[in-house]
Structures are given as C-alpha cells and as structure tokens.
Amino acid sequence: MAKGQAVGINKGFITTQLEKKLQKHSAVQRKGKLGKRVALVRQVIREVTGFAPYEKRIIELIKAGSAKDSKKATKIARKRLGTHRRAKVKKALLEEAVRAQRKK
C-alpha cells in the first residue's frame, strides 16, 4: 500500500482502488473454463462416438461394484491417462455415465 514515500516498503504514488463492482475481470481469469459451445460440441461427439475401449473396461469394473474393482478401474485409468488426478476425474465422469444409464 503506497504512502507517497520515495523509498521503503510503502514507497510509491498514492492511488485509490476501484470498487469491486467497477473492476473488470481480465480474459486470463476465464482461461480454462468450459464455454457453452465447446460443451455442446463435446456432448454431441460423445453421443455419436460412444466410449473408448479402455473406458468400456472401466465402466464394466464400476458396474461390478466391489472396492477391489473400483481400485482396478482407477489403476487402468491412471495407466492410460498418466496421472492420478486425471484418473480420478475420468472415473467420476464414467460413474456419472453409469448412473445415467441406470436411470433410463
């Protein structure tokens, strides 16, 4: 916080901060967020192409339902996708797909 001093930790020109409602978000803050158009395109592609073979294997293990199979599903996903975090996200996505299939 500038106090108008020439040197030191509080050096610099004194300014007043804008209120929160007047501040604009920069484009970089939106980076990585999923837009409506991209989400729709991905959904259509998923409907047309279905699941990859490794995803089908994971779905079968999820349907089995035991803790052992759940761990094996995570291991398969991690092997294919590279990291544990990506594997967890993919497994959650496929679990949601299985739940949607059961509802129909």
UniProtKB/Swiss-Prot annotation:
GO terms of biological process kind: translation
A cellular component term, taken from the record's GO annotations? ribosome
UniProt entry keywords in alphabetical sequence: Ribonucleoprotein, Ribosomal protein
> InterPro entries, from UniProt?
Ribosomal_eL36, Ribosomal_eL36_sf
Keyword Nucleotide-binding among record annotations: no
Q: Name one Pfam family in it.
A: Ribosomal_L36e
| PANTHER family found in the cross-reference section | 60S RIBOSOMAL PROTEIN L36 (PTHR10114)
Q: Which family does it belong to?
A: Belongs to the eukaryotic ribosomal protein eL36 family.
| Protein name per UniProt | Large ribosomal subunit protein eL36
Taxonomic classification, please?
Eukaryota, Sar, Alveolata, Ciliophora, Intramacronucleata
